[in-house]
Amino acid sequence: MNNLQLEALLNETLSPQLIKDYCPNGLQVEGKVEVKRIVTGVTASMALIEAAIELKADALLVHHGYFWKNEPEAIRGMKGRRIRTLIQNDLNLYAYHLPLDIHPQLGNNAQLAQRLGICVDGGLEGHPQSVAMFGHFLQPLTGEELAHRIGQVLNRTPLHIAPDQADKLIETVGWCTGGGQDYIELAASRGLDAFISGEISERTTYSAREQSIHYFSAGHHATERYGIKALGEWLAENHGFDVTFIDIDNPV
């Protein structure tokens, strides 16, 4: 498929025009015209770029690309090395950030819910483009049980901040993959029993303790593996691309 046709297909699927983002979504660095082999991964790090080159990929498809709002505009240093390597190897770079978080089937939030056994009830912000979700478990569980489940699914032990009432059972839950810790306030105002995200701030601890809500910091990278993986699998199954997902270790 032509690289611009692939971008059009991804745009049609993920609808980036529907949500305001902090970076451009779509084809960020243009490479060879014909795309057959794609490598997917969470972040367009040099390690992932080199792995894609080793596999003779035509395109790299990621969740975290380049050209973020308020980042230095000059193409130099680490940013310069990455982009120069892409261009020298004629490697296309496609990136989809918030549109991939919120897709109802392929998105990071949807994929995490599926793996944790969460029944999705809706968007925490109350509109279709909400980047945080809420739902429920069919069977209530303790904070320790949910922490264990998260650890088993993501292969990473989460940081669990229990509320002052530590034995509170969890039936209703909110979540936002990546850096969505501040959505705990919306979750608490809705009266949810728990909130899950990738990261945690110092203030999150007190929000959890004082508002009677369990908080689980499960890892930015770990919570966002599965959307880009699902998108690649969809491209392979429905459009015949040769797709390889590569998970570059990141403990954050």
Swiss-Prot record:
This is GTP cyclohydrolase 1 type 2 homolog. The keyword Metal-binding applies. InterPro entries: DUF34/NIF3 (IPR002678), DUF34/NIF3_sf (IPR036069). Belongs to the GTP cyclohydrolase I type 2/NIF3 family. Keywords: Metal-binding. GO terms for cellular component: cytoplasm. SUPFAM superfamilies: NIF3 (NGG1p interacting factor 3)-like (SSF102705). GO terms for molecular function: metal ion binding. A divalent metal cation 2 binds at residues 64, 220, 224. The keyword Lipid biosynthesis does not apply. It comes from the Bacteria. Homohexamer. A divalent metal cation 1 binds at residues 63, 101, 224. It comes from Vibrio cholerae serotype O1 (strain ATCC 39315 / El Tor Inaba N16961). Pfam families: DUF34_NIF3.
